[in-house]
């Protein structure tokens, strides 16, 4: 759906003017850019006719090297050669658990870490910006025109912090970012799944993305011009590198080797990778390992990696359940990522989905191609009417009394989206409210991830439960969250843009999802207990306030019975027997309802005192 642009009077651009927009795949291993020329997507080469830019930056004494030129320094100068910077985006120093050769500076929690390099301290955002700047320069050199806008792809599991870090990097690189696009969505666009001739009915697609280090799967639906991501899932420690390691493990067993030196391990890994690639077109290959030679055929290779393939299929089935679809509901399966070149991978997908997967576009380039098509559409060059809707990877909500989570936006909700809900005060005279925003699938705040807090001040003093605070969650097309709160009577309001200083790793995101599934029943029971306790505490609080004012209405026996019921409820609140708490609440209400009737009579008497019957009749 092209965006309408409004120009200043007398400054409208010519109707035929083509604006330059590019799609960028900012990858962990390599990055690339593409654009649409004469209606067709084209991957942009550098001056040496290379399409892929290795995502590597080396900081020397007086110069900086990028891509292929930086590669030799990985061994020669590892501390000043940054590779796989994407893994550091949106994380704190404490989040970075994996092994790396770098000297990181920064506090353990809230501060963005930086790499200590010969050129000074460099943050992941700055390094990513340098890679993006290389791609921007490549595009402008190739097209001989300035770039007007860019669509940058991100993994479906990137959270708000990681997406925001990507936006900052684009801004530092001088790019006008049109939007961030989930990588699987970009792949679907590249294959033109929204352009198929038979679109009278809804069509569902699986995007199976097996890269070097991670696996992602998405289910998309195209319906009446709208391209919607129904569900996403993945495995953060599963990719082509893991297939290579499985081959190495097999080879070690064949050769009766327990431990390999670092140098020998490198030889085994290279041989395993070559064998894996050759088996895509050959029935068998030879692995030359040290002074031995092993033969590996397709059936053996398939049995070696079956455990990894089973994991990917398990994720596919889970995402199908999330989307409430059966295997027979899927019209096409798209293969993305270099690891899907493997014959064994293609065979596994073919057998599970009972259809031939789409793999005609270079899997290393398909994401950038899809991003370029979307960029061309958003910049206004294309009249294509399809609309892309990504989804939220985790649920978003806020904390309520008792440490419970009230979800406003559920996971796998299409974005952009806004949700609004009313809340109220807990105590009499409450003039401020803390809004605590959380992310996750559990029912208790302590089991979810805190995204941020802000306070709404200036609430007019009222009786508990009378104030009306309207809270709005709004997620934009890039997956970035804004939360606002407004008190209805006074109009006071406050808001927060969720830009955490550090984010979730993909593994953390996956862990939160799995824990949500595993603890669903436990959380349901715990939530019931917490809600019961909150309601009981509210009854006790209201009773305490009433006794301060009108305790004289009760005789000694009534007061003793009420206090006894009150203490009994307090005792039950120390435990976790829901039925016992509910019974204690009901017993308290037997006595407190009689007390409430006495209070009501007193207040009516006060209201009518000194009022003539005729005056009262006239007023009614």
From Swiss-Prot:
GO terms for molecular function: ATP binding; ATP hydrolysis activity; ATP-dependent protein folding chaperone; unfolded protein binding. Pfam families: HSP70. GO terms for biological process: iron-sulfur cluster assembly. Coiled coil: none annotated. Keywords: ATP-binding, Chaperone, Nucleotide-binding, Stress response. The keyword Ribosomal protein does not apply. Belongs to the heat shock protein 70 family. PANTHER family: HEAT SHOCK PROTEIN 70KDA (PTHR19375). Chaperone involved in the maturation of iron-sulfur cluster-containing proteins. Has a low intrinsic ATPase activity which is markedly stimulated by HscB. This is Chaperone protein HscA homolog. It comes from Acinetobacter baumannii (strain SDF). The gene is hscA.
């Amino acid at each position: 759906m092209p965006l309408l642009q409004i120009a200043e009077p007398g400054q409208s651009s010519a109707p035929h003017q083509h604006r330059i927009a590019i799609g960028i795949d900012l990858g962990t291993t390599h990055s690339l850019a593409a654009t649409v020329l004469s209606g067709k997507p084209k991957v942009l080469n550098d001056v040496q006719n290379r399409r892929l830019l290795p995502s590597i930056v080396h900081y020397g004494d007086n110069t900086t090297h990028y891509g292929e030129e930086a590669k030799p320094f990985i061994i020669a100068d590892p501390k000043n050669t940054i590779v796989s910077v994407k893994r550091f985006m949106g994380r704190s120093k404490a989040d970075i658990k994996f092994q790396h050769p770098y000297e990181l500076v920064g506090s353990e929690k809230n501060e963005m870490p930086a790499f200590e390099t010969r050129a000074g301290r460099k943050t992941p955002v700055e390094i990513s910006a340098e890679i993006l700047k290389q791609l921007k320069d490549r595009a402008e050199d190739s097209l001989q025109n300035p770039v007007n806008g860019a669509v940058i792809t991100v993994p479906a599991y990137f959270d708000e912090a990681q997406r925001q870090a990507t936006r900052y990097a684009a801004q530092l690189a001088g790019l006008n970012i049109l939007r961030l696009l989930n990588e699987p969505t970009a792949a679907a666009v590249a294959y033109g799944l929204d352009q198929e001739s038979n679109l009278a009915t809804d069509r569902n697609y699986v995007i199976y993305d097996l890269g070097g280090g991670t696996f992602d799967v998405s289910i998309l639906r195209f319906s009446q011009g709208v391209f919607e991501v129904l569900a996403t899932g993945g495995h953060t420690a599963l990719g082509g590198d893991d297939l290579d390691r499985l081959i190495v493990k097999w080879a070690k067993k064949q050769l009766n080797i327990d431990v390999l030196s670092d140098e020998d391990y490198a030889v085994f890994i290279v041989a395993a990778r070559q064998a894996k690639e050759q088996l895509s077109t050959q029935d068998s290959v030879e692995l030359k390992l040290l002074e031995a030679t092993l033969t590996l055929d397709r059936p053996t290779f398939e049995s070696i990696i079956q455990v990894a393939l089973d994991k990917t299929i398990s994720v596919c089935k889970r995402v199908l359940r999330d989307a409430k679809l059966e295997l027979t509901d899927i019209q096409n399966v798209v293969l993305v990522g270099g690891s899907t070149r493997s014959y064994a991978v293609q065979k596994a997908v073919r057998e599970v989905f009972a259809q031939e997967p789409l793999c005609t576009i270079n899997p290393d380039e398909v994401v950038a191609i899809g991003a370029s098509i979307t960029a061309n559409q958003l910049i206004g060059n294309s009249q294509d009417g399809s609309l892309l809707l990504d989804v939220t990877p985790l649920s978003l909500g806020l904390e309520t009394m008792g440490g419970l989570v009230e979800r406003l936006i559920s996971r796998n909700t299409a974005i952009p989206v806004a949700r609004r809900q009313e809340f109220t005060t807990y105590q009499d005279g409450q003039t401020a409210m803390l809004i605590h925003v959380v992310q996750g699938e559990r029912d208790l705040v302590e089991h979810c991830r805190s995204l941020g807090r802000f306070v709404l001040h200036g609430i007019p003093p009222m009786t508990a439960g009378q104030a009306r605070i309207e809270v709005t969650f709004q997620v934009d097309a890039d997956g970035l969250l804004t939360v606002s709160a407004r008190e209805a009577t006074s109009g006071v309001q406050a808001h927060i843009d969720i830009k955490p200083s550090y984010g979730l790793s993909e593994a953390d995101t996956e862990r939160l999802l799995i824990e949500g599934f595993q603890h669903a029943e436990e959380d349901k029971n715990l939530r019931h207990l917490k809600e019961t306790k909150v309601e009981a505490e509210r009854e006790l609080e209201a009773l305490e306030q009433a006794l301060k004012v009108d305790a004289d209405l009760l005789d000694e026996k009534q007061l003793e019975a009420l206090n006894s019921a009150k203490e009994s409820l307090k005792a039950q609140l120390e435990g976790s027997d829901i039925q016992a708490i509910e019974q204690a609440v009901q017993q308290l209400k037997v006595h407190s309802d009689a007390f409430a009737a006495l209070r009501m009579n007193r207040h009516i008497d006060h209201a009518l005192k000194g009022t003539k019957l005729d005056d009262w009749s006239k007023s009614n």
